[in-house]
Design a protein with these regions (language model features):
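N-terminal TM1-TM2 helical hairpin plus the immediately adjacent luminal interfacial "cap"
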Residues: 14-132, 177-203
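Alpha-helical transmembrane bundle and helix-membrane interface signal
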Residues: 98, 148-161, 208-213
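C-terminal transmembrane module of polytopic alpha-helical membrane proteins
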Residues: 1-20, 175-250
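Alpha-helical membrane-embedding segments
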Residues: 79-93, 166-176, 225-234, 238
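Cytoplasmic-side transmembrane-helix entry/capping segments in multi-pass membrane proteins
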Residues: 103-111, 132-137, 158-168
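Generic transmembrane alpha-helix signature in multi-pass membrane proteins
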Residues: 142-143, 155-156, 171
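Membrane-interface micro-motifs in multi-pass membrane enzymes
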Residues: 129-150, 164, 191
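Small-residue faces within membrane-embedded alpha-helices
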Residues: 113-117, 140, 144, 161
Length: 250
């Protein structure tokens, strides 16, 4: 049996996020399968797959093609596009899924992806440009990783050591400035920024719900405590009153 050396195992665990998890693996397989179908359709001159399943704001607005908010996430604009997205999903998604659990991870992935699509639609309701790619969800994952492991070190371009929180701030700032400047034609920077904003609201919303739940639980315990004290006080006063009456002779 072939075994990896400890150094290789450590690199695999800490640099690449450890063994691939079930949901991350499934997402990568589905994305690659859809991309193969997409380029096969293009080879046969079928371009309607992008027009029908990509996010086309004007079609959502006037034809109510609401499924596009989900399906656009599985289409990509080229090998580099899908490679970067899937590599990022692999590197950062595994650890988040192990930490959160499958259900929360998958919910977060789709909520940030759909939220990014909605943001793109809102700023260009009557635009006929086709928006495709999982980048909104991927940027959401990067934000979540930065908030969960802010002081982890990553190597930017495999060379420059950088804390995750600074990497997320740089990428978020770049997406924000690009969305204002309208630079990089063909890149949906609003979707990138939208994925991060929706991800932040999702994570903070969970914090607020947890605090509200804790507050309610504390308030309920205090109410029960006061009710018990009142009941116990009544019982004690009754016992003291009965004792003052003296013994009952049968």
């Amino acid at each position: 049996m072939r075994r990896n050396s400890p150094s290789i195992q450590l690199m695999h665990t800490y640099f690449f996020g450890g063994p691939i998890t079930r949901t991350v693996k499934a997402l990568i397989i589905v994305n690659i399968a859809v991309y193969v179908l997409q380029i096969t359709a293009h080879l046969f001159g079928i371009q309607s797959i992008d027009w029908y399943f990509g996010l086309v704001p004007i079609r959502v607005t006037h034809e109510l093609m609401l499924w596009q908010f989900v399906t656009y996430m599985f289409l990509h604009g080229g090998v580099i596009h899908i490679y970067i997205n899937m590599l990022t999903l692999f590197m950062f998604g595994n650890e988040l899924e192990r930490f959160w659990g499958t259900r929360r991870f998958l919910s977060y992935y789709f909520i940030t992806g759909i939220g990014a699509g909605i943001c793109s639609w809102l700023v260009a309701i009557n635009n006929s440009a086709v928006i495709i790619g999982a980048s909104g969800a991927i940027y959401g994952l990067l934000l979540a990783y930065g908030m969960t492991y802010p002081n982890r070190i990553v190597y930017l371009n495999f060379l420059l050591p950088l804390k995750v929180k600074w990497m997320v701030l740089i990428m978020g700032g770049f997406a924000f400035l690009s969305s204002i400047a309208g630079s990089e034609p063909g890149v949906a920077n609003i979707a990138h920024l939208g994925g991060m904003v929706v991800g932040y609201l999702f994570l903070k919303g969970n914090d607020w719900r947890d605090r509200y739940r804790q507050f309610n639980e504390h308030h309920r315990r205090e109410q029960l405590k006061r009710q018990f004290e009142v009941y116990y006080g009544d019982v004690r006063r009754k016992v003291e009153s009965d004792n003052k009456k003296g013994p009952t002779i049968h």
